[in-house]
Structures are given as structure tokens and as C-alpha cells.
Amino acid sequence: MGRDAFKPKHASSVSISEVIDTGVNSNLLRTVGCSRVRADCFYKGVFIMNYIGIDIGSTCAKTVVLNEKKEIIQEFVQPTGWSSVDTAEEILQKLKLAGINLSDDPSCCVATGYGRISVPYADKAVTEITCHALGAVHLFHQPDLTVIDIGGQDTKIIQIEQGFVKDFIMNDKCAAGTGRFLEVMANTLSLRPNEMFELARLGSDTTISSMCTVFAESEVIGLIGKGEPKENIAYAVVDSTIRKVAAQVSRMNGEMSTFCLTGGLCECEYIREALSKKLGKEVISSPDARYAGAIGAALSAMKIR
């Protein structure tokens, strides 16, 4: 999102009595707890709601605002930092700059992710499994999916049937196969993650046996010391992650439906291709797939009001 996305809309605030003449049901306003609301919440007498989903992960925080047609009207991502509470406050301020003031608007907000309990202004906190499933079904327009979410500190495999979570596996006790693992390995190679992925396309014939981030880093350092070409080491790092994810998928019961990739790596074409090859089935993705959890949270907000 560019800087212009957060320019104030200069929306004025009006009282309930001032908007009754527009044809808006005043009882509806009182039901959602509004004494004063933004004037641009109304268009030709039609009451407009914003539905906000906030997904505070261990590495990044994603925010999505949906309108009543379930269309994305705002989305932004930022580093979580060391304090989820501070991140939640920063998100609140960004929403205000985007013209969405939760203290005045008849909006509904749901938080999810690692830091979901750190969002004091959220109407509800919902688990990330539920939100990622809702978001994926909405993004890919398919009721049957197997979601592969590679996050900063964990990897989730979620099996969805007819729009509902059937089963899931979550690797949250070890950073192996996660975004953090890849980040550490890229730093060891003095590369940015995207540079490492592109370099990995050129490599082959090298493996990293350890699934532990600490031991894997030692292996990488050892390979560097032996003069192994950097592209081969990059290949080994990515291959290690792909094998870890595939092992998680193999633990799921039943036949796997369409695979979709969500999380921060959703736009990495090499990761998607490597997963497709390893799983023997195409893995689909979308540029908005990193917002799957936040989209699911916003959809959950629609069920509250």
C-alpha cells in the first residue's frame, strides 16, 4: 500500500438525530452503540458498515477492511515488532488516517493470530485456524481446500471440506520449515530471502540433513567453509523447508483437496513450484493470500453484526 492509502478522508462526525432525515433507521445506529458516526458511513440513506480483520502474527501484522459486499477496501502489513500491544495501537492510528475511526464508526473488528489478545478495541478474538480457513475459501472461491500457511514462527496445514475445518496440523514448537528459518539461513548466506530463492533455482545436489534451525545453520556454515557453491546451499535450504512442509502434509488423514499457499511466502513463485513438485499436485496462490487470516477475521466480524 502506498502512502496515499492512509491520507485522511476528512470525514465529518454527525449525531444520530442529524442522520434520521437521510432515511437511516436510528434504532439500528443505537443497536451498534453509536452516538456519533462519520457522515460518510451513509450514502443516499444507506447505512454502510466497515468490517475490520487484524491478524497479528509473530513477524508481521496484517489488517484488512471489508465493505458489506465483502470487497477489500483497505489492506496493509507492517512488522509486529517486540510488542503486540504497540502494534495494535499503530494499526488503530493507521485506520484513523484511512478515515476509519473505531470510536465513532459503526464498524466491527475481529482480531486473530499470535497477538490477538493484544487488540483491546477488537469486538472479538478468533483463532487463526478458523480465520485462515475462512479467508482461504473466500480468496480461492473453493469450499474444499488444503491450506499451507508458512508463517514467521509456525507452519499450519489446514484441511477444509465444504467450507469448514476438518483437520489441521500446526508446527509451533520448532522454527524449522518456517519463515524465520529461511530468514536465518538467508542472513547466513549474506542474502535477502528473495535473493536466496532466485539463487536456489540455479542450484542442486546438496542437502541439509538437520531440521533444527541452529544445527541447520551450522551445516550451512560448514558447507560455506568447504567451498560449496552458494546456489547449491540456497537450494538445500529451500529444499529442507519443502521437505518439512511435505512431511506435515503427509500426516493429514484422507485425500488432499486443492492445495493453496498462504502466508508471507505466497508471492514466492519458486516456493510454490517446489511445493507443487514435491506434493505431486499444483499448489495455487494469490497476491492477497498473505492477508488470508485478516480476511477471515473481517469475515468473522460480519457474523457478529
Language model segments and positions:
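Short glycine-rich, Thr/Ser-proximal phosphate-binding strand/loop in the N-terminal lobe
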Residues: Y51-E90, V165-C174
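Short beta-strand-loop/turn "lid" adjacent to the catalytic site in phosphate-handling enzymes
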Residues: Q74-T80, A98-T130, F140, K166
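Glycine-rich phosphate-binding loop plus the immediately following alpha-helix
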Residues: S84, Q162-I208, C212, L299
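Phosphate/pyrophosphate-binding loops at sites that engage ATP/ADP/AMP, CoA/4′-phosphopantetheine
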Residues: L92-S107, V245-S257
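Glycine-rich phosphate-binding loops at beta-strand->alpha-helix junctions
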Residues: Y114, V249-K278, A289-G293
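Glycine-rich phosphate-binding loop of actin/hexokinase-like ATP-binding domains
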Residues: E128-T188, S285
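Glycine-rich phosphate-binding/hydrolytic loop that grips phosphoryl groups
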Residues: L134, G179-E183, S286-R305
